[in-house]
C-alpha cells in the first residue's frame, strides 16, 4: 500500500532516529522503505550497509558530481516505488505512533481528489526569529530537546497522543515532507523540477504546479511528527548554528531561477501557502 522514502545527505545521527521511529511507530510499519543516500561521507553508507536487513531497507548509495539534492532524491526514490502510495520523509524527522494511518485516513476521506497530505509538526527554535505558523509549532529547545543526543522521545510521544486526541481539524496547506501522495499523481505532476537542485524553492515550485493541476492540500492535526529543524539542509551543527554555505548559495541561485521560470515572486495566502504569482 505505502512505500516510505527518505533521501539524505550526511545526516547520519538524525537518519538513525528517523528510520527507527518509522519502523517502530508506523501503523504500516512493514511497508517497503527506500533510502537514497547521496554523496555521504559521515558514515551513512557504512551504517546502511550494516543495518539494512535489521530495518528491512532498500538502500541506494549514490555518488553524483552534480548533486540531485533532496528534491532530486525524492524523484529517485519515487521511480523505485511499486506501491499505490508514496510517503516521503526527511531524514531529520521523528514520527509518532500511527502518524501514517492518520494521513491515510485523511486521504481516504477524499477518494476522488488528487491530494498532498502532510503531518502537523513540532520543531525546536533553532533560529532566533523562528515562530509558530499554521501546521508547525515552534517550541523552546529545552521542551523536548533539540539534538539527536538530547531528544526526549517518550515525552514527545505523550505530547503527541494528547495533541492528536484533543485536536481534529484540517489546514488547507502543503508542507515539505512528510507527504502522502498517490504514486500515479506524483508521476502525473512530474515530481520535483531538477532546475532547483540541490535545495531550496523546489517545494514552492512543486506546490504551484500541483495547484495549477487541481491538487488539494490537507494538513490534519491527527498526524504529528517531530522535525529537528533543517538539519538535513542547513547543516546547523556543522556551522555554529548558521546555515551551510551550500544552502545559502542554493537559496540565492534558486531564487534567480524561480524568477526566470515563473516571471514574478510567489504570493501566499493566510496559511502561508503559495497561491500564485504576483502580477
Place the predicted regions along the sequence by residue.
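Short, acidic, metal-binding catalytic loop of nucleotide-sugar glycosyltransferases
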Residues: 20-30
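A conserved acidic beta->alpha catalytic loop
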Residues: 37-46
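Glycine-rich, basic loop-to-helix element that forms the pyrophosphate-binding segment
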Residues: 64-81
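Short aromatic/hydrophobic "clamp" motif used to bind/position activated sugar donors
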Residues: 86
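Conserved donor NDP-sugar-binding/catalytic core segment of glycosyltransferases
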Residues: 94-147
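A short, conserved alpha-helix in the catalytic core of glycosyltransferases
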Residues: 103, 172-190, 195-224
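Active-site-adjacent helix/loop segment of glycosyltransferases
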Residues: 125, 131, 207-279
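A recurrent flexible, glycine/aromatic-enriched loop bordering the glycosyltransferase active site
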Residues: 145-183
Amino acid at each position: 500500500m505505502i512505500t516510505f522514502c527518505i533521501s539524505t545527505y550526511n545526516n547520519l545521527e538524525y537518519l538513525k532516529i528517523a528510520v527507527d521511529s518509522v519502523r517502530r511507530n508506523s501503523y504500516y510499519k512493514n511497508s517497503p522503505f527506500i533510502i537514497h543516500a547521496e554523496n555521504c561521507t559521515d558514515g551513512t553508507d557504512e551504517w546502511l550497509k550494516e543495518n539494512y536487513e535489521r530495518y528491512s531497507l532498500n538502500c541506494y548509495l549514490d555518488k553524483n558530481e552534480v548533486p540531485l539534492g533532496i528534491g532530486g532524491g525524492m524523484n529517485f526514490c519515487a521511480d523505485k516505488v511499486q506501491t499505490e502510495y508514496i510517503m516521503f520523509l526527511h531524514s531529520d524527522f521523528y514520527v509518532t505512533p500511527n502518524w501514517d494511518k492518520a494521513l491515510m485516513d485523511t486521504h481516504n476521506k477524499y477518494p476522488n481528489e488528487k491530494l498532498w497530505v502532510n503531518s502537523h509538526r513540532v520543531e525546536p527554535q533553532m533560529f532566533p526569529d523562528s515562530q509558530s505558523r499554521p501546521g508547525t509549532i515552534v517550541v523552546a529547545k529545552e521542551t523536548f530537546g533539540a539534538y539527536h543526543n538530547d531528544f526526549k522521545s517518550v515525552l514527545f510521544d505523550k505530547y503527541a497522543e494528547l495533541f492528536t486526541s484533543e485536536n481534529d481539524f484540517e489546514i488547507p496547506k502543503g508542507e515539505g515532507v512528510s507527504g502522502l501522495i498517490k504514486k500515479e499523481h506524483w508521476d502525473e505532476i512530474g515530481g520535483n523540477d531538477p532546475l532547483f537542485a540541490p535545495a531550496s524553492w523546489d517545494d514552492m515550485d512543486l506546490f504551484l504546479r500541483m495547484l495549477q493541476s487541481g491538487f488539494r492540500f490537507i494538513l490534519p492535526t491527527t498526524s504529528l511528527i517531530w522535525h529537528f529543524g533543517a538539519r538535513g539542509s542547513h547543516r546547523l551543527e556543522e556551522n555554529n548554528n548558521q546555515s551551510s554555505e551550500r544552502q545559502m548559495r542554493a537559496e540565492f541561485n534558486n531564487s534567480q531561477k524561480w524568477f526566470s521560470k515563473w516571471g514574478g515572486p510567489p504570493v501566499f495566502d493566510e496559511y502561508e501557502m503559495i497561491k500564485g504569482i504576483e502580477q
